[in-house]
Amino acid sequence: MGTMNVVGLAIYLYAGFLSFIFGFISLYAFIKYSKLERKNKEIIYVYVDNLKNFSPYMFYSILLTFTIVFVIFALFICFVFNFDLYLGLTMLFSYFLIIYLFCFKKYRVEIYKDGFYGVFQN
């Protein structure tokens, strides 16, 4: 394996690690913070919806932009350094997993009397 392939693989792994950490830490903090708000609050309405419909628009646009930029960067790295096709497929699978969790998976939403809401997995 040449020196450039090692450098490219290191960049690819580093970018993948950062995208995983930053993508899921923000999602975890969003869900965890809403769980802390539900103590001692009266629930007035419960419904099921996906995250993109009740998350802040800026959070939604940043997450999608970040994942799309990462996909383009990873594809560029794959083609420039002639990586295996399985790395590209793994990257696409992780992208579709993020899209599924954020856009299509349904979560339980509870609206409280004071106007706050909580997001929970079914």
Curated annotation (Swiss-Prot):
TM helices/strands, residue ranges: 11-31, 61-81, 84-104
Gene Ontology cellular-component terms listed: plasma membrane
Entry keyword set: Cell membrane, Membrane, Transmembrane, Transmembrane helix
Domain of life from the UniProt record: Archaea
Predominant place of localization: membrane
Membrane topology: Multi-pass membrane protein
Localization (cell): Cell membrane
Name by which UniProt lists this protein: Uncharacterized protein MJ0226.2
